[in-house]
UniProtKB/Swiss-Prot annotation:
Disulfide bonds join 31-74, 38-60, 44-71, 48-73. Keywords: Antimicrobial, Disulfide bond, Fungicide, Plant defense, Secreted, Signal. It is found in: Secreted. Residues 1-27 form the signal peptide. The gene is LCR85. The keyword Protease does not apply. GO terms for cellular component: extracellular region. The keyword Signal applies. The lineage of its organism: Eukaryota, Viridiplantae, Streptophyta, Embryophyta, Tracheophyta. This is Defensin-like protein 97. Its main location: secreted. GO terms for biological process: defense response to fungus; killing of cells of another organism. Belongs to the DEFL family.
Length: 86
């Protein structure tokens, strides 16, 4: 009975790993386009979405001056494997 449990567990692990390896992976998210100053994440997302350039939101990051934050708009970058297939 113990060997049946071990083999069932091994099959489950193989199936899970196969699904994970075969599922498409999205590109990574890069936030590198400055879009002005922001005070909170909500305002930064609004700024980036209003630009309408396929941005997926934005992030407020601290500037070098105290009390100031810079809004960086984010976009998805495709993985290198997807770029090579194009």
């Amino acid at each position: 009975m113990g060997s049946l449990r071990v083999s069932t567990f091994a099959v489950a692990v193989v199936v899970c790993l196969s699904i994970l390896l075969m599922s498409p992976t999205d590109g990574r998210r890069v936030c590198d386009s400055a879009a002005g100053l922001c005070s909170m994440l909500f305002s930064c997302n609004t700024q980036c979405n209003s630009l309408g350039r396929n941005f997926t939101g934005g992030e407020c990051s601290d500037a070098r001056f105290p009390g100031l934050s810079v809004c960086y708009c984010c976009h998805n970058v495709e993985s290198s494997a997807e770029m090579e297939s194009m």
